Amino acid sequence: MPVTARIDGLGELLDQQFSVVSRGQLLALGMKDTAMQWRVRAGGPWQALLPGVYFGLTGAPNLLQQEMAALLYAGPGSLITGPMALMHHGLRSQVMLETVDVLVPPGRQRLSTGFVRLHRTQRMPSRFVSSGPLRFVLEARAVADTVRLLTELRPK
């Protein structure tokens, strides 16, 4: 398949996920690694936001796109928590929204990177809120995690 070949379902997936897609999703659609590399080359039409996560546009991603990228990077069942989750629940936090905090199961083999801070937990919430493809913890968990983060990040 040429690197510029049209991939069935790609446009719909990008539309559903704020122009953010994972390598695994692209492979499932039939895209080869060489085609992905061609798209994210210097001056190319896409960019790599995180390891294995691509942004199908040029320019800086907005918060929704960063959140989508964070969830794709963190893997299935992951949930956004902390200040970003509070924002989606309509609560404001004094924390700058530069980092997406994500809960992941304890066995997940990923490290925090870029704008994503992963938090492994034995207590993954069974209930959560969805907004399109994004998944967030409930308000009480978001508040508790934000307080914990503020305590951990406070200068000593």
Label for each model-derived stretch:
Residues 1-156:
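Short gly/ser-rich loop at a beta-strand->alpha-helix junction or flexible surface loop bordering the NTP-binding
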